């Protein structure tokens, strides 16, 4: 959230568990690193060896300057390096191919950075660096290689939103019409998923601390509304860690309290009316959950430091599936996806449901 000390606390406290011997919906892969991984991005690319059939390319990032890439569905991972970046904490990554990706680091001031590669990670261009000590980036999302947005904690009581429309220059959005942040309110840089940009107009992000709120803009960030959710709140360690919206404007939020990661009260909430009203899940996940991804219409998967769940009813009931220590997740479709977590943990999604057909359309 608002300081490097806070980020370090989150990192240390979420390293408390290790992977079990058995996983049901997730197949553990060998990453070659033992650092804490915080973000994952996957994309289909045409395979020239298979007449252009789509194959997944997966990128992941985390602490100690670690950036990983796999072009063979996670069987092998290549470690990539940013010049002078070995001490950076890369909490966000967005990929477009085996060649092009953005990576975002967190920290106070100039430790918050955005880099881009166009040569598969051989070199990285620094596009943004925090120009004042109050800057603390939390997450990055993209609609395309040229149109992306990054969220940062409040500067002068307004959340920082950076945007690029050319894939090169990042500029802050005007904040005159944004509601002020509450004292101590911020966003969690836990899984690169507290910000959503489903199209070029709609923007949503979730917060934590004194309140677990969802800010929403329907005009590209020019004007904003804000709504309080029933997710656990009131402590600097509690609030919304992940936010997602589907094609029908149903919004799901997940969170918890990283100082009490086993707390399962008020972890998940859903809005079926585009964020206007919120309902707590009837059956909650089993503790802090930091990552969320759409499987298919009404079906979602949640990951966290103490386990994973799926829901098949828009987040009303969550069913435990695994007990891996995962931080972030991304699915490409109903059968293909990856999650990353503590101690270099990487797991591939294995859909065990017999009733979920078709292709997901994550937003």
Enumerate the predicted regions with their spans.
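Residue-level hotspots at or immediately adjacent to binding/recognition sites across diverse folds
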Residues: 22-363
């Amino acid at each position: 959230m608002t300081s490097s000390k806070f980020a370090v606390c989150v990192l240390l406290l979420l390293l408390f568990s290790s992977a079990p011997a058995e996983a049901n919906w997730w197949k553990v892969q060998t990453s070659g690193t033992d650092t804490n991984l915080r973000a994952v991005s996957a994309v289909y690319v045409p395979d020239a060896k298979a007449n252009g059939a789509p194959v997944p390319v997966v990128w992941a990032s985390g602490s100690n300057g670690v950036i990983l890439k796999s072009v063979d569905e996670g069987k092998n991972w290549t470690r990539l390096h940013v010049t002078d970046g070995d001490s950076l904490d890369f909490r966000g990554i967005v990929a477009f191919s085996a060649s092009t990706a953005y990576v975002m680091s967190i920290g106070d001031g100039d430790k918050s950075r955005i880099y881009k590669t166009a040569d598969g990670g051989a070199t990285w261009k620094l596009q943004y660096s925090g120009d004042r000590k109050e800057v603390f980036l939390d997450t990055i999302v993209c609609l395309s290689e040229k149109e992306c947005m990054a969220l940062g904690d409040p500067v002068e009581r307004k959340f920082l939103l950076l945007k690029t429309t050319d894939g090169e220059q990042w500029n802050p959005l005007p904040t005159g019409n944004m509601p002020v942040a509450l004292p101590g309110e911020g966003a969690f840089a836990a899984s690169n998923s507290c910000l959503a940009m489903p199209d070029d107009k709609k923007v949503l992000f979730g917060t934590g601390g004194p309140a677990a709120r969802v800010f929403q803009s329907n005009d590209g960030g020019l004007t904003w509304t804000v709504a309080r959710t029933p997710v656990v709140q009131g402590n600097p360690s509690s609030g919304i860690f992940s936010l997602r919206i589907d094609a029908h404007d149903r919004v799901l939020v997940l969170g918890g309290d990283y100082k009490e990661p086993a707390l399962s009260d008020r972890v998940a909430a859903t809005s079926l009316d585009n964020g206007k009203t919120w309902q707590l899940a009837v059956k909650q996940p089993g503790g802090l959950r930091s990552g969320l991804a759409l499987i298919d219409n009404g079906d979602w998967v949640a990951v966290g430091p103490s386990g994973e769940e799926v829901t098949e009813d828009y987040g009303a009931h969550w069913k435990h599936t695994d007990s891996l220590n995962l931080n972030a997740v991304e699915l490409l479709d109903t059968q293909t996806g990856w999650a990353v977590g503590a101690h270099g943990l990487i797991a591939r999604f294995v859909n065990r449901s017999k009733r979920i057909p078709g292709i997901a359309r994550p937003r």
